[in-house]
Amino acid sequence: MITKIHARSVYDSRGNPTVEVDLTTTDTGLHRAIVPSGASTGQHEAIELRDKDKTKWAGKGVLKAVENVNTIIAPALIKEKFDVKDQATIDKFLIDLDGTPNKAKLGANAILGVSLAVAKAGAAAKKVPLYAHVADLAGTKKPFVLPVPFMNVINGGSHAGGRLAFQEFMIVPSEAPSFTEAMRQGAEVYQILKTLTKKKYGQSAGNVGDEGGWPDIQTVEEALDLITDAIDKAGYTGQIKIAMDVASSEFYKEDAKKYDLDFKNPDSDSSKWLTYQELADLYKSLAQRYPIVSIEDPFAEDDWEAWAHFYKTSDFQIVGDDLTVTNPIRIKRAIDEKSCNALLLKVNQIATLTESIQAAKDSYSAGWGVMVSHRSGETEDVTIADIVVGLRAGQIKTGAPARSERLAKLNQILRIEEELGEQAIYAGTSSEPPHLYIFI
């Protein structure tokens, strides 16, 4: 039984305030969760409540969300005497308590902190690891699947300076025999890439972006050339693939219905903006020259026509993030309109674990893949590592093998791999792919 819930304001990896929730039960003591936040957020995401008091934290304070946990959620939830193992009932209670379709009243950051703390308490009450509890809640079959890490090694877009429009360039060690070996391969390529980047762009290029990748690259081709060179020098040509998160909503010009790859330049030449057909052709051209297996958010979040066109004419994994925002209504539309074939699952986009699990199950039912993801404003909380294993998703995106808030998740999966031993398989080499792993 829950005896105490207490929220406080702490800081994320960008130095911005975020919500931490402590939940105490009679039997298993204290359970803690910290909520992440995004930089390039989809407009259809659940609402992250910020104070908007410009005199404090430039308006990014979360004191109202903290107050909502402490004065509204905590007394209401404790009064109900719920069993912490009953995640679905508690999450429904939180959704009903908020009463809005996008969690705008209490705040997605308030609700998610409580939902994840409840999940940890539920696992402890069952005396099982969190990933096993998530698997029970989701009805996931065995064996457990350890995910392929999509490592964001070059940061552009809204995550870094420089002119680079595309937000993330990831290496994908999908041919490794285990998660441990995938981490080694990825870390080796990352270190070589660091050396190559500093050699080409100078010592300052060794500074990293929000997610641990190198930020000082100017064009898409430069980024891809550097990555393929690093893969080659590490000895993994043909074994390590490339994925991109374009985050194209960030540079979509809605009035012109075109895409501006020079969007960081205030004097961008509008004659060089691209139609969605031209942008689709660019992706296909890049995929012919580089080992690209997955593209996330290739088009703007409401440019549905572009997504459908690309889906019909391409043969790699197309991941919806801003398009789908882990929301069942958006996911259903994307399935019906054949817009993409994989979901990027971010728990803070929908704000409860139960709804996140349902989003994954809806995606699996459509034959989609699922990639569990961090946010650019991360914390030391490792819950998504357990979620990706519990959901058997087979893919995780949690930054570069650098910066502790990124590595915390990857290190947790290393521990899970060690704990599970023969009871787990690595998604990249599995003879029984988790779901849509045919592209990699």
Curated annotation (Swiss-Prot):
Name the predominant localization. Answer: cytoplasm
Query: Binding positions for substrate?
Result: H159, E168, E296, D321, S373, H374, R375, S376, K397
- Gene3D superfamilies assigned: Enolase-like C-terminal domain (3.20.20.120), Enolase-like, N-terminal domain (3.30.390.10)
- What are the catalytic residues? E211, K346
Source species, domain of life: Eukaryota
User: Where on this chain does Mg(2+) bind?
Assistant: D245, E296, D321
What are the boundaries of the signal sequence? none
Q: Where located?
A: Cytoplasm
EC number(s): the record gives: 4.2.1.11
Q: Which residues form a coiled coil?
A: none
Q: Which reaction does it catalyse?
A: (2R)-2-phosphoglycerate = phosphoenolpyruvate + H2O
Q: Which GO terms describe its molecular function?
A: magnesium ion binding; phosphopyruvate hydratase activity
Describe the family membership recorded for this protein in Swiss-Prot or TrEMBL: Belongs to the enolase family.
Q: How does it assemble?
A: Homodimer.
Please name the PANTHER family in this protein's record: ENOLASE
Q: What is this protein called?
A: Enolase
Q: Organism source for this protein?
A: Tuber borchii (White truffle)
